[in-house]
Structure formats: structure tokens, C-alpha cells
Amino acid sequence: MAAYTKIKKDEDMVVVDKSTGGNGKYVFDPYNSLNKEISEEEIRELLAKYNVNVPIHHLVLYKRAFVHRSYTKRPAAWNEQNNITLVAKPEDCHELYTKSNERLEFLGDGVLECIAKFYLYKRFPKADEGFMTDTKIELVKNETIGRIAMEIGLHKWFMLSKHTEMKNLRCNHKK
């Protein structure tokens, strides 16, 4: 019988060593049955709820905004080089994605920071830059954004690997 040992090959995934003699073969199971992809109708309802009246172009970008890098395909060559075998996708799970939200997050972080700075500049006309910087940091930090995402229900559509789900990253805020 093979000995199973959890090891860490990458920050976003856990693989299981299935070797008996240290031959370094690994099994990777990222599939998460809790994932639910957001639909166009759900996007429309969410935007309408907050009075955001914009047409939905490029639905794929809205959907990609919810894809964590842990639920993306790794290059086959990387898997082969590291002796990693991807388990078969269970029927109740979504396919792994080819792209994550990271590049969109990079843009979004910049837009959010710009909006926060503009708001604070207008809202506190006599405040010094130290106060505005500290307040901006509090507004745009992950814990704040995670709490707001939970409050408005965005967490329902995050696409995360099973391991990332176990680390409770669907709720990326401190309580």
C-alpha cells in the first residue's frame, strides 16, 4: 500500500506524495464542488441592486474576475517536469480555467486606489496627506475589500481550488 504524505509544491496547491520509495510521483486534486460560476443574469441583478447601469460587454471578463489562480490549469510541461498527475474532474465540478483574475486585480487595485484618493481628497479638504494616506490604506486593504465582498455576496461565485477553500480564502477578511 502506498504511503500518502501531503507536501507543498506551490503556494496555491497541495499535492499528495504517492511514492513508496521516494520516487517523487504526485497527485494534484484542485477540483472544488463548492464553486459556482456567476451567470450573466446574476451579474445584471448585482449591478442593478447597486444602481450600476452599464451594458455587459465581454462577459468573459466578469467571470474571470472571480477565478483565483488556484483554480487554473498548470502547464502540462510543468506537471510532467514535477511528476504531477492531475486527477480526473468530478462531474459536479467546473473545468479548470486557463486564466485567473490576477491581471484584472492589478488594474482594479489601481482604479480602486485612485477612486479612494479622489474621494478622500474631496471629502476631507483640510486633511493632511498623512491622514489621507492612512485612511486610503484602510479602505483598500484586502481585509476591507474581503469584508465588503462578503457583505454584498460576491464570495458565492469565487472559483477556488479545494486546498484554497480549506484555507478559508473564500472569506478573505479578519473577523
Question: At which residue positions do the language-model features occur?
Answer:
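RNase III-family endoribonuclease catalytic core
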Residues: 2-175
